[in-house]
Amino acid sequence: MHSHTNETAATSTTAGAVTNGAGGSGAGAAGAHGSTEGKIRCIFLSEFHATAGCKISCQVPDNYISKDVFDAINVYIIPKQHLQRCILTVNAMDVKIVGYPVGIQDQQKYARNAFLFNLCFVCDSRARSVQYEPVVKKLSEYLIMMEEESCFLSREDDKRRLQNIFETVLRDLNERKVATIVEGDNTIYLKIVMHKPDPPPVKDHMVPLLLANLRDAPLDNWDLTTQQILPYINGINHVARIAAEADVETDLVKSCIQNLVYYGVVQLLPILKYSNVYMTQNLKHLIQSASLSGACRKYVALRPDKTLPSVQRIFQFYASMTHGVTLRAICQRLCPQHHNIDERRMVIFGLQHRFIRCIHKYPVFTGSVPSGRQKMYTGLISFDEICCKTGLSPCTIERDIEKDTNVTVIWK
């Protein structure tokens, strides 16, 4: 079972057949909630009855969750008070149940001074369920309002109306991903928003680039780690350097940046080195789009107060990027700074808009028994990653590889 309030994990418990998962609505959540998109199989309302105890009072379709299954897991459906008003997901007995347990306190209305209930969505145990969590919470808050206004849930007379609501929600969310409920003067709109897949893991040698101007946002809007690392995210510093300069543990920095990537405010780039080789792709978009070429001219200008570089000059620079030609060689030949072009910002803009891509080097040890750094030359670890892991300069690694006749370099 996992639980969380908003985007922060609150409690995590494992007991018997109930599995432990990682709560959250951001990066990491999608994988934890299952691997396949699945329909809502059932919607039910459970409540704690004054004499009968924990029971299902309304269910669509009827008896989808059997009494035996419910009896085995009901301690997690109507949990202790500290787990109320937060999403709980129970994965047991071939079903996954997403709920939002609630307790309404009122000594005059209720026999036990409180009305405890939980609205639950049920899907297959291996189905992804994170997209249902905001809907469960919103519908639960709607039912809380209805209960406080007219005892809509606790009155037996209203159970048929509740069943009609569940039938509508189940059908419309499965078929159209949206549902509208009109009950008296109250209307509620529900919509399933599909979550993006998790971004790939962030590594030490990756370079984050801000895609939105977050520095202008009040720092109070961000968690402590983001506040600490934000000043060091500039499209040049790699993750390990950001962690060192911000004095934040590297794993925390990676987690924070992965979250920013998930929300689309950060893009990961390769380390910018003058020994890098780049290849062009989709370069025609720079010429075809006036707005894009205008943005590029402003972004790459070495001195924005001077005449902006021409699109033709920028295009010439990008078009010179080809296999076997380093950034250093291009700069020596074209002298971009003489034309008010900052070559580093030009590379960043090209990577960001996918005009160019970096060709990475992967050393491969071809001898019999590797030793020392040779153990890293597997063909799976890039040159940049090796430099970051060892703390050695690219020149040192280059010399090391050139002297070793048992090492071949693959470019890809």
Swiss-Prot record:
GO terms for cellular component: autolysosome; cytoplasm; GATOR1 complex; nucleus; Seh1-associated complex; vacuolar membrane. It is found in: Cytoplasm; Lysosome. It comes from the Eukaryota. Disulfide bonds: none annotated. One of its GO terms (biological process) is meiotic cell cycle. Keywords: Cell cycle, Cell division, Cytoplasm, Lysosome, Meiosis, Mitosis. InterPro entries: NPR2-like (IPR009348). Disruption phenotype: Pupal homozygous semi-lethal. Under nutrient-replete conditions, larvae display a significant increase in TORC1 activity and adult escapers display a small, but significant increase in body weight and a reduction in climbing. Newly hatched males display decreased tolerance to both complete starvation and amino acid starvation, likely due to decreased triacylglyceride (TAG) storage and the inability to down-regulate TORC1 activity and activate catabolic metabolism and autophagy. Component of the GATOR complex consisting of mio, Nup44A/Seh1, Im11, Nplr3, Nplr2, Wdr24, Wdr59 and Sec13. Within the GATOR complex, probable component of the GATOR1 subcomplex which is likely composed of Iml1, Nplr2 and Nplr3. Interacts with Nprl3. Belongs to the NPR2 family. An essential component of the GATOR subcomplex GATOR1 which functions as an inhibitor of the amino acid-sensing branch of the TORC1 signaling pathway. The two GATOR subcomplexes, GATOR1 and GATOR2, regulate the TORC1 pathway in order to mediate metabolic homeostasis, female gametogenesis and the response to amino acid limitation and complete starvation. This is GATOR complex protein NPRL2. It comes from Drosophila melanogaster (Fruit fly). The lineage of its organism: Eukaryota, Metazoa, Ecdysozoa, Arthropoda, Hexapoda.
